[in-house]
């Protein structure tokens, strides 16, 4: 008398298909996540640079010209305005430049700069992102216009 043994489990082909599907999903997800991380780091630079805007505006309102440096604008030295991914925020003739850290920032933006440039009218200053060394795809939407 013969008994039939029912084999259970996955075959090698089924396992290979599952591994291939996971690899395809990872190939799509990892670059998207890397872009997300870089954009978050650039946002830190934008936030730190934007925090210096009121000081520049106050200087322009009081003196009628752009401040030549951080000290003139009433800000701390450039390296004292820093974050995890930003090494300094420097004011130069009204422009605010955030420089990304050479060690902690993603390699795509290390030592790159984000520049906010002012355009003054009689009652306000409008800030524009000037072309910087950061790739456009990583910039906030307000800088891509």
Regions found by a protein language model. Give the residues of each.
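N-terminal leader/signal peptides at the extreme start of proteins
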Residues: 1-13
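Short, conserved catalytic or interaction motifs in soluble domains
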Residues: 3, 27-30, 35, 54
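Residue-level signal for short amphipathic helical patches enriched in basic/charged
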Residues: 7, 25-28, 37-43
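Generic leucine side-chain signal with a strong bias for well-ordered alpha-helical environments
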Residues: 12-15, 25, 48, 116
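Internal alpha-helical transmembrane segments of multi-pass membrane proteins, especially GPCRs
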Residues: 14-17, 38
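Alpha-helical hydrophobic helix detector
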Residues: 16-31
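Conserved hydrophobic/amphipathic alpha-helical signal-anchor segments
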Residues: 35-73
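Periplasmic/extracellular, small/polar-rich flexible segments of pilin-like filament-forming proteins
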Residues: 61-145
């Amino acid at each position: 008398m013969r008994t039939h043994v029912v084999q259970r489990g996955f075959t090698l082909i089924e396992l290979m298909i599952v591994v291939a599907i996971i690899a395809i999903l990872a190939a799509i997800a990892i670059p998207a996540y890397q872009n997300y991380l870089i954009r978050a780091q650039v946002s830190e630079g934008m936030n730190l640079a934007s925090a210096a805007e009121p000081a520049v505006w106050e200087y322009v309102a009081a003196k009628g010209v752009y401040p030549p440096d951080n000290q003139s604008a009433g800000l701390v030295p450039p390296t004292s305005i820093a974050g995890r991914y930003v090494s300094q925020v420097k004011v130069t003739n009204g422009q605010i430049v955030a420089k990304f850290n050479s060690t902690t920032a993603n390699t795509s933006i290390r030592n790159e700069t984000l520049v906010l440039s002012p355009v003054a009218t009689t009652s306000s200053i409008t800030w524009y992102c000037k072309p910087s060394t950061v790739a456009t795809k990583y910039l906030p939407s307000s800088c891509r216009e």
